[in-house]
Amino acid sequence: MVLRIPHYFDSFVCTAGECRDNCCYGGWQIDLDEDTVEFYKSVKGDFGDRLRASIDYTDTYCFKLENGGCPFLDDDNLCHIYKELGPEHMGVVCTQFPRFSEYYGHYKETGIGLACEEAARIILEDTKPFHIVERTIDEEEFEDEEYDGLLCKGIEKVRNCLFDVMNSDMGFADKLSVLLDTGEYIQELINRNDYKAILEYVPRYVSRETLPYEEADIMEIWDTYDSMEVLNVEWTEFVKNLTASLHKDDYVRNLSGFNKENYPFTGYDKLVCYYLFRYLLQSVYDHDFAGKIYFMIANLILIKEMDIYIYKRDGMLTKEQHMECIHMFSREIEYSTDNLDTLSEEFLFSDIFCKERLESIVRTLF
């Protein structure tokens, strides 16, 4: 099997106790896989008893949190299971997070997620043009009846072209317009089962008039995202304050002031490449290529909105605050299956998620 990873993947090393929002104590649900639970059932002595008493067996296996944290953290926020049983007997979630993996025929794609602050730092501070590294690994090919090799080959080709667009010197708003055009056109080809035409597609920028910008459109996107499952109460409070403040007075002035600062650390282009790598090929299975593009663009719009709100509130935006916005947003949106499913439905049926309305926002914000 061939492993594909982003070029920055090997830079990641867990900072463990130094992490400010450690995934072991930040209120995260810590899921356990069946093999790990079965092993824990066999562990002898007091530690084995403690393991079994700490597992919640209802619905899905997970640890019962204590004060929002894993019950096996010591005073230095390090893992008792690691020390007592070794890393080979930690759950899959514990050993793999923030890594994610998807399988496409004889390819396995693995990356690191923005919900981890160290992973987010690596992604946003990277200075190289985005590219994928391939390695041969000793792992059996993943079989899925819904996998279509020809469609996958076409979407891979389109994705590589979009990476080239993002790595080019084209204006950022123009790049996002190319993504939106590509989303609409490739979706039409998928709907017609014209997979060979996908292989021939070359993204290009077409200058055109856009719809007049409507501030209500951004609020409609916020309403969609704010109606979903809440994983952290800080998110609810932040969005409440943002929507009550940012769009109540002189939004254009705040946006203009933020853009004039030209903060060098925002890395919005790097976020797009992250989303392209992580999500675009998933349309091989659900055939919703356009929805993946809308997801990327909507996420980018809201993350910039969060940045502008902090700029208005504090008179400035620090690199640390920007990183925290991305970290908080990713944790709420990307790490809830229910939220991702809800958004997938919205991208299919909600009028706000279309090329024309999203492009009018993009042209105003970026």
Where are these regions (language model features)?
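General N-terminal leader/first-domain-start detector
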Residues: 1-47
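Short, compositionally biased low-complexity segments
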Residues: 11-19, 129-134, 271-275
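Compact, glycine/acidic-enriched structural inserts
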Residues: 41-52, 127-135
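Internal, well-ordered alpha/beta segment that forms a basic, Gly-enriched binding/recognition surface
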Residues: 77, 84-180
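Short runs of predominantly hydrophobic/aromatic residues within well-ordered alpha helices
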Residues: 16, 20, 159, 296-300
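General secretory precursor processing signal
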Residues: 17, 22, 26-27, 73, ...
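Hydrophobic, aromatic-lined core segments that form the binding pocket/scaffold
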Residues: 171-366
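Immediate flanking context of iron-sulfur cluster ligation sites
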Residues: 2-19, 52-91, 108
